[in-house]
Amino acid sequence: MTAQETERIRRELADSLPHEMFCFQCEQTAAGTGCVWRQGACGKRSSTANLEDELTGTLIAYARCVHDAGVTSPCAHASLPMIEGMFCCITNVCFDDDAVRALIGRIRERIDHVSGRHGVDAADYPAYDMNLVWNADEDVRSLKSLLLFGLRGMAAYAYHARMLGADSQTVDDFFFRALYEISATDDPQTLLGLVLECGRVNLECMAMLDEANTSTYGDPVPTTVDLTIEPGPFIVVTGHDLADLEQILEQTDGRGVNVYTHGEMLPALAYPRLKEHPQLKGNFGTAWQNQQREFKDIPAPIVWTTNCLMPPKDSYADRVFTTEAVAYP
């Protein structure tokens, strides 16, 4: 049997199986085309994937409601649930169905609030059907997906900046406008313009986060990082939310508990304000994708702060802690 025949049979078999979800957000997606069965390549269950589609559709409904109400620049309070909802849908952030349902409820409350204040009917804003994106013309689907995934990535930066007290009206406005346009247009040129604009706005968002980080913790300096684990109790913090790490350091000051970064938290060791805490000892392990092997039987709690969570193995499942939008049931 040739490789081509094997691939044809594999695809026919795949097409014959019932599809329980659709997600092609990450480069590890099944067969390079999309995860469609009970569990995604990332470990996300189909129920969670479908709820995240509902959450995204509800965020689009929120954007439509704000647009129709004539609100051109939503305030920071109105924008935060939008940012948190987008952040929740990034790969490796949320595996908890109840947490997604709670976010959907918060967005519905925002729709009710806006409609009540501005004379529009909340009933006119059900969750947008994401199948209209996934099943659209190939070019339209590609552009809308690229825009949506870009918005989700930008939401992570915006959320971390917000936790440090920084926000940008330009960034916040673009979340609403871009999501509205996903539901309002199928014109490829309009969508391409929005994709390019997303890149420009994302650059501004990254600059905002960098300014928030450096103004709070100082400019990073060249730092030698210790990779050994000292005897005694310790905590591992992974992800890239510096505010969460700072809170853990403040709560462990003088308590004889050491703190180690992991994965994307490694750069935190270069910030002068964080280096002032002597219990921030160094880095444990390597990259986030190695966590299931590296955390096996680890005698310490691990705190996930951003999009780096993989379904935990039994050997350390009782030591998993998450913050903010990150959640595991």
Residue ranges and their predicted role:
Residues 2-329:
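Metallocofactor- and cofactor-centric catalytic cores in central/energy metabolism, strongly enriched
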